[in-house]
Amino acid sequence: LMQMHSSYVVTDPKGTVLVECGKMLEKGGYVIKSLNTINFRKSMHYNPFSYIRSEKDILKLVNTIIVNTKGDGDKSGEDFWVKAEKLYYTALIGYIWYEAPDHEKNFTTLLEMINASEAREDDETFKNPVDVMFDELEARDPDHFAVKQYRKYKLAAGVVCSKRLLN
């Protein structure tokens, strides 16, 4: 690093390289960008939604989310619940990417949609705000990518899966 002859991407699990070499590299004309997953206040911000260019990218993002949030147990693979969860996230992220204004294309919007996805045991006809959003989108564009994914999720999952995923 001290030779400063190239561009670098450095992993720094202990957080020492940035402290020890950061100022030197900045003085040498380098632009330092840090993604700190331990202390987000010391991190630049990363929005994966900014890198979505196609439906294939949505699927890659969903797969990355699933892989990085699954448990270590025997059932952490491609079982029914994981498949339903993938359809659900694909539908929500597809909706955000195609329909949301640029300032709402982020994980905050995704989490708000997940939190609004309430299911009620005693009322199978209940529609939460996300169901209503998808109904409106389907009325406007029945072949929309997000609508197709949400339809598959609802068909595969039903109320039972909704309750399990949202609890």
What are these regions (language model features)?
Residues 2-95:
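Switch/coupling segment of Walker-type NTPase motor domains
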Residues 81, 85-86, 90-167:
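Non-catalytic, charge-rich alpha-helical accessory subdomains
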